[in-house]
């Protein structure tokens, strides 16, 4: 029995949810999102909440049950509050700046990296060593943050590179003489 799946997703005021077949559409103040629920799961909207149930007791249906409920909950939270990920840049000369509709990263390479910002995502650089990625789709916000971090991930000796805010970097000791 899925502990996550059995809880219905409450839909707050100001957010409308419609279920058409296997598609859940959620509309809120920040925008509109939709998710196609897998065929092994039944979804319905009643009493101001979206509930998800497995069609049968097969292992696949039960494993998709909690996942589908979490996806629907992310849609509701995304259109009402939105999501954001903060990245920190550590290292001498490492910085980020907005250049029109692109993010310009100086990460110690012989060239600057121009990251084209995808639609539906907002990137802000409050400081040259800080990047804030925000949007309504949790998966896309995380994906964009991961792509930016991938250009120069934190290294274990000095901790230089791009890391998530609050991320612990396992540090190593240098070699001894």
Swiss-Prot record:
It comes from the Bacteria. InterPro entries: Ribosomal_uL6-like, Ribosomal_uL6-like_a/b-dom_sf, Ribosomal_uL6_a/b-dom, Ribosomal_uL6_bac-type, Ribosomal_uL6_CS. GO terms for molecular function: rRNA binding; structural constituent of ribosome. GO terms for biological process: cytoplasmic translation. Keywords: Ribonucleoprotein, Ribosomal protein, RNA-binding, rRNA-binding. Part of the 50S ribosomal subunit. Belongs to the universal ribosomal protein uL6 family. This is Large ribosomal subunit protein uL6. The lineage of its organism: Bacteria, Pseudomonadati, Pseudomonadota, Alphaproteobacteria, Hyphomicrobiales. The gene is rplF.
